[in-house]
Amino acid sequence: MHRLYKKTITYLLSKDFLVTLLVLSIMLAIFWYMLWASQLSRRTILIDTLPDFTIYFTFGIVLGLIFAGRALYSRSVKKKLKHMLEMFLYGFVLGFLSIVNIFDVYVYLFPDDVISYTSDYKIVFPGPSTGKSSRCEAGIWVKDIHTGQFKQLCTNREILFKKRRQGMDALWITARVNKLGTYIVDYRFTYK
């Protein structure tokens, strides 16, 4: 028993275990960030002129080139090209996915102002997509005054029944805004 305990302690303090723990922690943090940022993007409206996809793609290519450059020095000549291509692909995917919602996060974290306004709305069934194969029960289309764009928000029949009364034909929207877009904090049904 003492021998097993000693081996376990030795392994837990080894460099391999600590490196594995560090890599898993970083990957878990990236995964958490991607989930959090994708939730933010459901209520964020970016301006039309922002070349977001080009920036995501460029960042992925740059990170892929960094990974491929690092791989250039680590393999023998026979497998070098294949390893470089694999590392480029890994770097590209990691870079692309980790930055894909960065502008939504920026709008959420760094608002220049908080505004409130009324907007017309339209309720549709079913609502926006919430994943690969699921959808919200209902959706509310609203027009953002700051960007001039329409956004579909997720809701359900129960919320509509509780919060909406006959004759309520507008939404009172509270939003955080900056030069890149709008994050809708809250909305309430109201009378015009």
Language-model segments: residues:
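Membrane-embedded alpha-helical segments of integral membrane proteins
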Residues: K15-L72
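Internal/C-terminal transmembrane anchor helices
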Residues: K79-Y106
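Short, Lys/Arg-rich, polar N-terminal cytosolic tail immediately upstream
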Residues: M1-Y11
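OB-fold (S1/OB) nucleic-acid-binding surfaces
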Residues: S129-C154
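OB-fold/S1-family single-stranded nucleic acid-binding modules
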Residues: R176-K192
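Membrane-interface helix-boundary motifs at transmembrane edges
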Residues: L12, T44-I47, Y73-L85
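Short nucleic-acid-contacting surface segments enriched for D/E, G, S/T with interspersed K/R
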Residues: N156-T174
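Structural detector for short beta-strands of small beta-barrel domains
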Residues: P111-S134
